[in-house]
Design a protein with these regions (language model features):
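Catalytic cores of nucleic-acid endonucleases
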Residues: 117-171
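Eukaryotic partner-binding/assembly regions in large regulatory complexes
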Residues: 200-258
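Extended, amphipathic alpha-helical scaffolds
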Residues: 246-395
Length: 395
C-alpha cells in the first residue's frame, strides 16, 4: 500500500516523500488500512520503495503485494497524473469491498485501472470485473509482462488466466501488459490461436511519454505474409501429430473426424483457415471448422440451404457435448462469440461454396477431402491463392 489512514481518519500518501522524512512519521504516527481498517506498518527499508504492509493479510485483496506491483502502481498513477486525469491511488469502493489500484474519472465516466501481477483464478478475476461493471465503473486490466509465457517464435502460451486479459481493439484483439523496470507498456496485437493453447502475436512497446489514446488505439499493420507462413507451418504440424498428443483421447471433435473416416491431413484445404476473432473459441481452429464442414456441407446436397441460426443451434448443442468449447472471458466481455464462425462462412461463400440468399446460405459446392500424397502441397498453394481474401477478412 502507498496510502493509509491516520488515527484521525485522514488519508496519508507516501508518494513524493523522502525516506528521511518518513522516519520521524513512522515513530510518531499509527496507520490503518483504508479498506479493512486493520493496523498497517510503514516500511522504509533500503531495498524496497516505502510502503505500508498489513501485519496479516487484507481481506479486500488477500493475495498481498510485491515490489513489482508497488512499482507498477506508482508508474501508472504518475502516468495518468501527467496527462491531467486526476487519478486516485488505491481507491477503496466500500459498496464493492474492492480497492482499485488506480481510480479516475473522464468525460463523465468512471474507470478502475488494475495492474495484475498475481495469477489469480479466472473466477475471482471475473467476479471483480463484473462487480466494477455492475457499479458503472469501466475496468482497465493490465497484466504484468513477465506473466506472458513466450515460446520460441512469435507465440505465447494461452492460459485461462491470460485469456482474461484479451480485449477487442479497433484493429485487432490485444493484451496490454506493463513492465515496471524500466517502465513501459507492451502491447500484444493481432492475436490468433494456432492451437488450443498457443497464440500467434505481434508486439509493440510504448514508453510512458505516450498518452492513453496512443497506447490503447495504436496498432501496427498486420504482417499477413509472415503470419500465413507461420500458420501454414503450425497447422501442417498439428495435422500430422495431433493424434499423438496426450490430449487427443480427450478431444471429442477429433473422435468425430475419425468416426467419419477422415484423417486430419485429408481434410479439405478450405478447412483450417485463419479468420478474425478466433480467440473466442477454445477448440482448435481446424476442428471447429471441420465440424461445420461435416454438418453443413459434406452431409448435404448442392442446392441445399441452412441458416446462421441453425449453425448457432448446432454449436450450442456441440458445446454441451464438449465438441466445441468457448473461452469464457471473451463471452463475459459481451462480444458476439459467433463472429469467427460468420467470417468463416463468408470466406466459404467468397470461394464459391455457398451463396447468401436473405438469411440463408445456399450450398453451391462441397469442399472435398485432399489426396493423401499431395495434401501439404495443396494446402500451401491454396493459402497463397487466397492471401488477398484472407487479408480482407481481417480488415
Amino acid at each position: 500500500l502507498f496510502v493509509a489512514k491516520t488515527r484521525s481518519g485522514e488519508l496519508f500518501s507516501l508518494l513524493g516523500r523522502s525516506k528521511d522524512s518518513l522516519g520521524k512519521i513512522k515513530r510518531e504516527t499509527s496507520f490503518f488500512c483504508p479498506a479493512c481498517g486493520e493496523p498497517v506498518i510503514l516500511k522504509t527499508g533500503a531495498k524496497k520503495v516505502p510502503h505500508f504492509s498489513h501485519y496479516r493479510h487484507c481481506p479486500v485483496k488477500p493475495e498481498g503485494e510485491t515490489e513489482t506491483h508497488l512499482l507498477g502502481k506508482k508508474w501508472l498513477f504518475e502516468w495518468l497524473e501527467k496527462q491531467g486525469y486526476r487519478p486516485q491511488l488505491e481507491y477503496f469502493l466500500p459498496d464493492l469491498q474492492q480497492r482499485a489500484d488506480v481510480f479516475f474519472e473522464r468525460a463523465g465516466k468512471k474507470y478502475a485501472l488494475e495492474f495484475q501481477c498475481s495469477p489469480l483464478s479466472l473466477s475471482l478475476l471475473a467476479d471483480r470485473d463484473e462487480s466494477y461493471r455492475r457499479s458503472g465503473i469501466i475496468p482497465i486490466w493490465i497484466v504484468l509482462d513477465s506473466r506472458i509465457r513466450k515460446e520460441k517464435g512469435p507465440f505465447f502460451s494461452a492460459t485461462d488466466f491470460l485469456s482474461f486479459f484479451i480485449r477487442e481493439g479497433p484493429a485487432s484483439p490485444f493484451i496490454l501488459a506493463f513492465r515496471p523496470d524500466p517502465p513501459m507498456f507492451v502491447k500484444y496485437v493481432h492475436l490468433v490461436p494456432v492451437s488450443k493453447s498457443r497464440f500467434y502475436y505481434q508486439k509493440t512497446t510504448f514508453p510512458l511519454s505516450c498518452g492513453m489514446k496512443e497506447v490503447f488505439r495504436s496498432c501496427p499493420p498486420f504482417d499477413v505474409s509472415e503470419f500465413l507462413a507461420v500458420w501454414q507451418r503450425e497447422v501442417g504440424r498439428w495435422l500430422i501429430f495431433c493424434h499423438l498428443q496426450r490430449s487427443a483421447k480427450r478431444e471429442p471433435a477429433l473422435h468425430a473426424l475419425y468416426a467419419s473416416a477422415i484423417h486430419p491431413t485429408l481434410l479439405p484445404k478450405e478447412v483450417g483457415i485463419p479468420v478474425p476473432r478466433m480467440h473466442a473459441i477454445e477448440t482448435h481452429p481446424v476442428l471447429w471448422q471441420a465440424l461445420i464442414w461435416l454438418e453443413f456441407f459434406r452431409q448435404r446436397p448442392r442446392g441445399g440451404t441452412f441458416s446462421m441460426e441453425e449453425v448457432k443451434t448446432y454449436l450450442r448443442r456441440s458445446e454441451k457435448t464438449g465438441l466445441v468449447r468457448w473461452r469464457k472471458p471473451v463471452l463475459a466481455e459481451g462480444r458476439d462469440p459467433f463472429s469467427p464462425v460468420k467470417k468463416y462462412l463468408l470466406f466459404l461463400a467468397k470461394c464459391g461454396f455457398a451463396r447468401i440468399r436473405g438469411n440463408r446460405y445456399v450450398i453451391e459446392g462441397i469442399p472435398e477431402p485432399l489426396p493423401a500424397d499431395r495434401w501439404r502441397e495443396e494446402r500451401e498453394k491454396f493459402l497463397k491463392e487466397q492471401k488477398a481474401l484472407i487479408l480482407t477478412l481481417f480488415h
